[in-house]
Amino acid sequence: MSNANPFFSQSLAERDASVRGAILKELERQQSQVELIASENIVSRAVLDAQGSVLTNKYAEGYPGKRYYGGCEFADEVEALAIERVKRLFNAGHANVQPHSGAQANGAVMLALAKPGDTVLGMSLDAGGHLTHGAKPALSGKWFNALQYGVSRDTMLIDYDQVEALAQQHKPSLIIAGFSAYPRKLDFARFRAIADSVGAKLMVDMAHIAGVIAAGRHANPVEHAHVVTSTTHKTLRGPRGGFVLTNDEEIAKKINSAVFPGLQGGPLMHVIAGKAVAFGEALTDDFKTYIDRVLANAQALGDVLKAGGVDLVTGGTDNHLLLVDLRPKGLKGAQVEQALERAGITCNKNGIPFDPEKPTITSGIRLGTPAGTTRGFGAAEFREVGRLILEVFEALRTNPEGDHATEQRVRREIFALCERFPIY
């Protein structure tokens, strides 16, 4: 069916050259840079198509079969697919796929299971936790009496004895397990035992490792936690968004009410469509192979960096991310982040446990392998990337403001590498 109305027929290029130009520049950046930000990934063309669909037009307040608007028959179909697939992916009894983000998912759980002023125990941001787990600037740090556990100074591993001691002393309503920058596996059974000992609910935020869990390469928190939250991007390789899982029917009802109408109005149906596609992709054997490569690539990258004289927090990784301590090289995180970006490698400065530097400077960087693995990099390519990173490090030691010649040479090598593994 043709339509002469230019509102419906004009492309973005015809309608808005400025926005199209910015998008094309971002596409070129993604095509030509190696993405090592651990929380980022690259979605499939199918996910892009779903997220750019006519579902963006549809308001669908409520839940499938119980909407506050008409015309939701096919919105219901899409959301039901997303719910069924994510439940199957994580062997969960109940799922809410409407949270717009991981932060919204976490907020919904806290709204459902705790009252303002209640004590909440989460991992310290300084030790690798997330802002939404009770950091003072976040809503969770303002609404609740938020206490923080950390890691052992000797091992840099979560100090479960400290978690237990804080729980016994303060009797939190909610204990949060999860992280933003922690490279080791979590002991969900230990967390649940601690929660049960003080009558607390256990929430696991699996945002970073959801894909690893979906592939069966990490224990499934749904088997231990009262409630599990996650993002849909990162290792799960979907659109930017969130979801909540539980096996408890009463908690599920509270979560649904907390998401809508508690925190959100209408769901983003085009994003939920993208989530459904990504969940379907994650149910395949190809996805398990992908996650195995993500993990192997993290080991390969870490081995090269350690051999080159930098420290890895905890000595290595069990997952997709590496927390790099730059102090042996005499470098700072902000300095390295900027130099690597000039060289065609994107990462983020990141504090390390007990970091003496300010959060805007840091003594470390966080690296991740999901995006590079999605575009096809294997261990050989990640070893090459590690070698190039070390060259930038060494140049910075001589020229702390940046070595233009080294950065441009590395940039050319990175560009050539990316050309071998094109995206879109």
Curated annotation (Swiss-Prot):
Catalytic activity entry: (6R)-5,10-methylene-5,6,7,8-tetrahydrofolate + glycine + H2O = (6S)-5,6,7,8-tetrahydrofolate + L-serine
Molecular function, one GO term: pyridoxal phosphate binding
InterPro entries: PyrdxlP-dep_Trfase, PyrdxlP-dep_Trfase_major, PyrdxlP-dep_Trfase_small, Ser_HO-MeTrfase, Ser_HO-MeTrfase-like, Ser_HO-MeTrfase_PLP_BS, SHMT-like_dom
Keyword Cytoplasm attributed: yes
Principal subcellular localisation of the protein: cytoplasm
Record's GO cellular component terms: cytosol
Pathway: One-carbon metabolism; tetrahydrofolate interconversion; Amino-acid biosynthesis; glycine biosynthesis; glycine from L-serine: step 1/1
Entry coiled-coil feature ranges: none
Gene3D superfamilies (alphabetical): Aspartate Aminotransferase, domain 1, Type I PLP-dependent aspartate aminotransferase-like (Major domain)
Listed EC numbers: 2.1.2.1
Keywords: Amino-acid biosynthesis, Cytoplasm, One-carbon metabolism, Pyridoxal phosphate, Transferase
Enzyme superclass (EC): transferase
Annotated positions of the N6-(pyridoxal phosphate)lysine modification: 234
Cellular location(s): Cytoplasm
UniProt-annotated site: Plays an important role in substrate specificity, residues: 233
Keyword match Lipid metabolism: no
Cofactor list: pyridoxal 5'-phosphate
One matching Pfam family: SHMT
Subunit structure: Homodimer.
Matches recorded under PANTHER family: SERINE HYDROXYMETHYLTRANSFERASE, SERINE HYDROXYMETHYLTRANSFERASE 1
NCBIfam families from the UniProt entry: PRK00011.1 (NF000586)
Physiological role: Catalyzes the reversible interconversion of serine and glycine with tetrahydrofolate (THF) serving as the one-carbon carrier. This reaction serves as the major source of one-carbon groups required for the biosynthesis of purines, thymidylate, methionine, and other important biomolecules. Also exhibits THF-independent aldolase activity toward beta-hydroxyamino acids, producing glycine and aldehydes, via a retro-aldol mechanism.
Protein name per the record: Serine hydroxymethyltransferase 2
Taxonomic classification: Bacteria, Pseudomonadati, Pseudomonadota, Betaproteobacteria, Burkholderiales
Gene: glyA2
